[in-house]
């Protein structure tokens, strides 16, 4: 199987493209709803967008942008709408964006974003569910994030790349798409160093220019394919991946009894379907990703023995457990820990996917279930 371009990178890079006054070409984009919503968002702002979903190529001309506000109907469909605050603020000095939507997996406060904007010199207010950020001139500063927020790190990088002087971000997120967004901005002429480390340093530039850029593969999609093979048994080569980005996922699959071989841009996973119990705790990158937690739980649900899954990122990410229980799983949730007693077999059932990653996990459960999994609704 071949893995698509990264979902999380795509939405950030597309929003960052409006920082350039000349056309940008973005390649390896996945044909997913969030990208389609991003296209609608750019066109709402006045940008010209040519999007070829089959080729995964998008050209964005933001020289025609004529407004800095976004409507609620777009923002409620995509969590990443918050990235337009940083991009619009840097380019136009104003952004009016409703509080973002996205999957209901728990609190994802935007306070770290606002803190960063304010420290750069913006005035930020929230009225009737809409964020209004204004700045005549953004000025570089020293920002310490209270938690390594992916969204805040990306938003602050975008806002700071054209600020006057130098900005330092301490305790930033280190996920692969942080590095990819920084590389995209640098390809447009930004001066960002240290993405993926404990400290990011940004020297503001006057303006950014056009670029052609290909985004990294989606490590969560790759991991989901790997878990599907582990659960069903088989021998599959997963192509168009960066194995280093999958190290935590690979380690847990090996613990569970699978064999994984790594190549330059592919991984091979071999599973006989006989799985072992293990313990997993979600952590910021390079730890085990929270976006792989539901898929891991499905796998452990048919492993021998008792396993535990501890969710340390989001407090509402076990909503899928009731659905998996309908399929015969034996899972007890205590606070942020799921205690999983492996069963021999899942059985088909009518299930509801509470969020995107849970939906993928329930598909995997359906693949190994006895009988038909009738319907998976929502995302």
Language model: regions and residue ranges:
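Short, structured segments at the rim of ligand-binding sites
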Residues: 1-379
């Amino acid at each position: 199987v071949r893995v698509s371009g990264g979902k999380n990178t795509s939405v950030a890079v597309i929003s960052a493209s409006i920082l350039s006054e000349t056309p940008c070409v973005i390649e390896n984009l996945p044909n997913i709803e969030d990208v389609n919503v991003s296209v609608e968002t750019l066109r709402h702002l006045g940008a010209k967008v040519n999007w070829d979903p089959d080729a995964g190529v998008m050209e964005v001309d933001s020289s025609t942008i004529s407004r800095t506000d976004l409507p609620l109907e777009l923002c409620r469909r995509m969590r990443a709408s918050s990235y337009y605050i940083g991009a619009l603020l840097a380019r136009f000095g104003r952004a009016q964006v409703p509080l973002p939507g996205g999957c209901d997996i728990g609190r994802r406060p935007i306070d770290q974003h606002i803190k960063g904007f304010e420290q750069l010199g913006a005035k930020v207010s929230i009225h009737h569910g809409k964020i209004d950020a204004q700045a005549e001139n953004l000025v570089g500063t020293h920002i310490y994030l209270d938690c390594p927020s992916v969204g805040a790190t990306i938003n602050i990088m975008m806002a700071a790349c054209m600020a006057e002087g130098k900005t330092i971000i301490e305790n930033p997120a280190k996920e692969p798409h942080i590095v990819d967004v920084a590389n995209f901005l640098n390809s447009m002429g930004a001066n960002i160093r240290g993405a993926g480390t404990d400290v990011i340093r940004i020297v503001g530039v006057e303006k950014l220019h056009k670029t052609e850029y290909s985004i990294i593969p989606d490590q969560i999609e790759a991991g989901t394919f790997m878990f599907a093979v582990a659960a069903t048994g088989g021998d599959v080569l997963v192509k168009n991946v960066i194995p280093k980005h999958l190290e935590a996922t690979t380690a847990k699959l090996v613990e569970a009894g699978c064999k994984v071989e790594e190549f330059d841009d592919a991984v091979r996973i071999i599973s006989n379907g006989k799985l072992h119990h293990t313990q997993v705790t979600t952590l910021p990158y390079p730890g085990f990703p929270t976006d792989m937690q539901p898929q891991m739980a499905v796998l452990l649900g048919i492993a021998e023995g008792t396993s535990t899954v501890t969710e340390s990122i989001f407090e509402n990410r076990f909503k899928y457990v009731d659905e998996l229980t309908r399929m015969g799983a034996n899972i007890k949730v205590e606070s942020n820990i799921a205690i999983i007693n492996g069963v021999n077999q899942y059985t088909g059932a009518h299930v509801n996917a509470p969020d995107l990653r849970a939906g993928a996990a329930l598909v995997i459960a359906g693949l190994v279930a006895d009988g038909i999994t009738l319907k998976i609704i929502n995302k």
